[in-house]
């Protein structure tokens, strides 16, 4: 089944729920970046979180950047997600692998680092982007995003993120967020009930592996709270907007002198997209054409 995002409300629209299945797009990122098991889990969680955060935008061109800079060996983890359902991302050190944690699971927290910062940038596609920064809580990503939502957006939230990786690839990935909206923010009993129910689930990917669907999970959490599942599913996918044309435009920014030096020493130029690992080339005729265009423009 294709990856998708599903929305719901409950408690007379006092609760907002968003769930996303990202199995295929996470495996696409794994293959493109040749990610280790723990790097796959870290980037998969971050991309799912980005899609969930971006789902609140009404502007289709709006995007969210999630950057995690921890003191663990993975280095920077970055995801760029759009309200249109597209997402891309990378891990600075994609081949890092660690032993399982005490529970026998991928040690994402240690790989990310227990200290560091989470940066979130909202870009609506017009005006100036706005950003927030919070310290990492655990490096497990879901807890860090939850802390960001509570401190920077002042929205009580519960977030679950998960990626299950086998030798054959990613077999389950996604996330679920429940938010208590302002109209229900003072209902302490409601908040306590949600927290307990989320805690009882004991993980997101085990539910997917057991054959549970997003509507099933929504029903278990919110079925007795006037649950309203929105009928339209939004397709989500790994997508990068890089292209050969953009690579050539970037080369032109180097200037005529730098391009002449590249032409004389290498006779070609190569660029690898950080987000999708696509490789683009500019051969000698292309470099000569760029130099000619710059020379003409300077006359």
UniProtKB/Swiss-Prot annotation:
Pfam family, one: HSP33
One Gene Ontology term of the molecular function aspect: unfolded protein binding
Keyword Cell wall biogenesis/degradation: no
Cell location: Cytoplasm
Keywords: Chaperone, Cytoplasm, Disulfide bond, Redox-active center, Zinc
GO cellular component: cytoplasm
CDD domains hit by this protein: Hsp33
Family, as annotated: Belongs to the HSP33 family.
Family matches, as NCBIfam families: PRK00114.1
Record protein name field: 33 kDa chaperonin
């Amino acid at each position: 089944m294709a990856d998708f995002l599903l929305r719901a409300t409950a408690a007379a629209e006092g609760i907002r729920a968003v769930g996303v299945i990202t199995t295929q797009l996470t495996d696409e990122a794994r293959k493109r970046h040749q990610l280790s098991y723990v790097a796959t889990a870290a980037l998969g969680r971050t991309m799912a979180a980005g899609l969930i955060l971006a789902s609140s935008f009404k502007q289709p061109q709006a995007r969210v950047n999630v950057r995690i800079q921890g003191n663990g060996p993975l280095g920077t983890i970055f995801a760029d997600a759009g309200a249109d359902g597209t997402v891309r991302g990378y891990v600075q050190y994609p081949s890092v692998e660690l032993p399982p944690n005490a529970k026998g699971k991928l040690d994402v927290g240690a790989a990310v680092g227990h200290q560091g910062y989470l940066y979130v940038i909202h870009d609506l596609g017009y005006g100036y982007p706005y950003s927030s920064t919070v310290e990492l809580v655990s490096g497990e990503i879901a807890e860090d995003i939850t802390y960001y939502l509570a401190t920077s957006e002042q929205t009580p939230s519960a977030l679950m993120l998960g990626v299950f990786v086998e030798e054959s690839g990613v077999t389950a990935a996604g996330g679920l967020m429940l938010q208590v909206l302002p109209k229900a923010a003072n209902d302490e009993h409601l908040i306590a009930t949600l927290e307990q129910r989320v805690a009882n689930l004991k993980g997101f990917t085990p539910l997917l592996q057991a054959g549970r669907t997003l509507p099933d999970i929504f029903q278990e959490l919110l079925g007795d709270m006037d649950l309203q599942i929105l009928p339209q599913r939004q397709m989500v996918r790994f997508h990068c907007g890089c292209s050969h044309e953009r690579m050539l435009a970037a080369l032109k920014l180097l200037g005529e002198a730098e391009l002449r030096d590249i032409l004389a020493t290498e006779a070609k130029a190569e660029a690898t997209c950080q987000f999708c690992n696509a490789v683009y080339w500019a051969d000698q005729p292309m470099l000569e054409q760029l130099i000619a265009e710059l020379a003409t423009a300077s006359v």
